[in-house]
Every structure is written in C-alpha cells, then in structure tokens.
Amino acid sequence: MCIRDSIRKAYDKTGDLSVCPMITGSGGLTLAKHLEVPFVQEVIAVSTALTHYAPQTDVAIELGGEDAKIIYFEGGNVEQRMNGICAGGTGSFIDQMASLIQTDATGLNEYAKSYKAIYPIAARCGVFAKTDIQPLINEGATREDLSASIFQAVVNQTISGLACGKPIKGHVAFLGGPLHFLSELKSAFIRTLNLDDEHTIVPENSHLFAAIGSALNLSLIHISEPTRHLRI
C-alpha cells in the first residue's frame, strides 16, 4: 500500500510517467527481494546525495530511529561507523527518555531551549540511562535541564562510541530524522564539536537524504523492463 500510495500521489502531480521505486535503509534488502525492487546500500545512498547537494562535506552524522552513523569522506574514500546493534543514542532512545518525564521528542526539544544545567546521563543503554534519570527526577531536576541532558547524552554517545577518538572536523553534515526535527539536539552537537556556521551543513530535507540518494542511484542500475505493474 505504501508504494501504491506514493505512486498515486506522484501521478496526481506529474501525470502519466514511468517510475521505478528504490529501497534503502535498515531491513530494506529483504523487503527489496520480496518486492523485486532494486536495493541501494544506505551509506552509498547518503554519499550520493551529499555528493550532489553538499559536496564539501568532510563528515556526516546521521541519526535514525534504531541506529546511528558517522561517515567520513577522505580523499575519495568513504568510511562508515555505525551503531546497529543497540538503539542507545538513537531516535528510539530519545522516545524512551521522553516518556520518563511524561512528554515526547518534540516536548524534549521545547524544554531543552530553556535549560540551565547539564547532568551526566548514560546514552549507551536505555536501562543505564533510566537509572541516571530517575534519581535526578526524585531530586527535583527540571524538565528543561533533563531534556538538554538527554540530548547531550546522545551527543556524547555518538562521538565517543562511534568516532572512538577519530576527529570530527571540517565541514560536518547533520542528517536523519532526529537531527532534522530536533533543533536542540543539533545545537548540542554543534556546541560540543565547536562548529561555526561555515562548517555546519544542514541540508534541506536532511531527514530524506538516504531516500534521495537511492533515487539518484537509479542511473547506475540497468532495468530493461518493468518487473511489476501496480494498478492505482
């Protein structure tokens, strides 16, 4: 239904055109095989999108719902570091922490705009983070400070857990849903990495860069005839 609905919306805007769906992202390979749709590795998709829209990028930080990535671009080489085993420091972690202070991710973002202090919170695991947050709640820490501390924990986990000492410098792009929709999370990264405006890259539709890149990769895939027709 998702593909059919997307094609229907595209048809309403563009008229009768031949289209080819592409799939990327975590878990996408199995779905692509089932639907007989071309699959593009996510790091390739993101790299392609950055090449087109932000070619000056030296490092890309991408946060998703279940994983986090740092991608280094060095002299034509691409190195990806990914946290795909545990959801600590990702969008789902943020949702879990938000529920502890009876709000959602958007609420965290609004609270964090007025923080006064940052508390140390572990983002490596939701269980450990809860043991850090609950005493702070009991001691009367404000939601504003807790929200900013949760975002800072995500920043620390990403930098220490993925970069592992490798410098994040040059022009840094921020991608993925959490960094697109949560301005204070992005600000925490920028503040921690000491980035100025010149070296901070926030592309338009940054939450869709993997999808954009997968579409741009269509030209690299040979498709002779449509494998399936969808009635819309």
Task: Identify the meaning behind each predicted range.
Residues 22-23, 37-47, 61-65, 81-89, ...:
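Active-site nucleophile and cofactor-binding loops and adjacent substrate-binding regions
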Residues 27-79, 159, 163-164, 211-217:
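Conserved phosphate-binding catalytic cores of ATP/NTP-utilizing and phosphoryl-transfer enzymes
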